[in-house]
Amino acid sequence: MHLASLLSSCSLLLLLGALPGWAANNDPIEKVIEGINRGLSSAEREVGKALEGINNGITQAGREVEKVFNGLSSMGNQAGKELEKGVQGLNRGLDKVAHGINNGVGHTGKEAEKLAHGVNHAAGQVGKEADTVIQGVPHGVNQAGSDAGRFGQGAHHATGQAGKEAEKFGQGAHHAAGQFGNEAEKFGQGAHHAAGQFGNEAEKFGQGVHHAAGQFGNEAEKFGQGVHHAAGQAGKEGEKIVQGVQHGVNQAGKEAEKFGQGVHHGAGQFGNEAEKFGQGVHHAAGQAGKEGEKIVQGVQHGVNQAGKEAEKFGQGVHHGAGQFGNEAEKFGQGVHHAAGQAGKEGEKIVQGVQHGVNQAGKEAEKFGKDVHYAAGQAGKEGEKIVQGVQHGVNQAGKEAEKFGQGVHHAAGQFGKEAEKFGQGAHHAAEQAGKQAGKVAQGVHDGVNQAGKEAEKLGHGVNHAAGQAGKEAEKLGQGVHHAAGQAGKQEDRLQQNVHNGVNQAGKEANQLLNDGHPGGSTTQHGGAATTTLTSGASVNKPFMALSVLWKSVTSIIP
């Protein structure tokens, strides 16, 4: 009995001692805590991996962006050098044009002086048998005479008996001035050859006078002044052609009737009122302009259009940074395209940059694709930027003649078929005037701005660095996916990457703004040496592990 009670007591004690351990092993709270600990450890490892992946992705993105800017900087420097060479070539060409124009003007002066002497003699020695011009004309017109025919014949014989048959007044004046041609060329041709024979094919009177006189004066003096200067530069301010013709022929009166009026009365009193110069010369030349345009129109076309085939002068000057011929790329178009389009077959620089940097272009030839490869892939298929700029500036298209040849022809021939670049440059350099943009300004605007309508290069680069085209995924999204969709940190990551890219765009704009005034980006801009502004996010994770752990443990009591 005693033994049984002892055994029962021991069993009870053992049971009581085991109960706490059993209860402890089966405690659900402890299991929950252990599960939470294991979950937090696993979460910590996963978050660490995610943050490390994000950090690596951002670092890699920063390297790629830096490579892009290095490529853009190199491209900009090389392009600047090529553009500088192009500008130097333009300067040399313009110097040659200036020398050619000076020689042409000097020769024109000599010929004009000869013409003035000829006219002087023709006007002063009307004829030994004839009375003075004032008397001769009334007798010639009113007293028909035996040998006196029409006024054309009368003037013809009076000024030197240039022919036996009564040639028209245009021919008479042509021969009277020195028989500048064997066949009665049109008045425009006559004046053209009299001034120096600037062209093999007789250009119209407008062109003839334009080239003959050289457009003396900055603001292109009126036609009256032009003819006045061409005949001898009788005055500094150029008296009106009425006075010029009056004094040149005989000084028939003190006030000098207008040329139209003088010829009008001399030819037979075609009207009581002095007709305009265009009509006067038109009638005086024997109505040489039933087929030809009136002198007024001729002068207008000569200065503005240079004939129906020639572009209007306004367009010519506009295209003087614009378009000078149908076959050759007109100078304006040449310069504009040299910094903008480089011809129909050349890559348009503005579009090229925009497409090349933003959309990588659809065709491998375009300048934009060159920039794209030059900045990112060193141009495996696209031509190098050097070649692109070289072709754009120096050749302006395969069909356009080189600038040197153009200037050479410009100073020497002024083009037999198409108005060669020289003629265009002559118009652009000579008649640009104070109202037209100077050539230097035109080139400067053409190279640096490519027109007010063209987007600035900085704008293009900004889009290139910031958007990389509408079709390309944003850099922030790319890094986001590359890192593995970190989750709630996505917005902050995208924002930081966006800020970094925007800052890079600002640096690119600063680079272009720094390179803009000089016409070439020879100095290294900020984008070349600038690291990613969001470098803090590149070199360290967005949230430290210790901070994350504290935030997790703070929710556990």
UniProtKB/Swiss-Prot annotation:
Residues 150-175, 422-441, 464-490, 509-533 are annotated as: Disordered. It is found in: Secreted. Keywords: Secreted, Signal. The keyword Secreted applies. Residues 1-23 form the signal peptide. Residues 153-175, 476-487 have a biased composition (Low complexity). Pfam families: SBSN_GxHH_rpt. GO terms for cellular component: extracellular region. The keyword Secreted applies. This is Suprabasin. The lineage of its organism: Eukaryota, Metazoa, Chordata, Craniata, Vertebrata. The gene is SBSN.
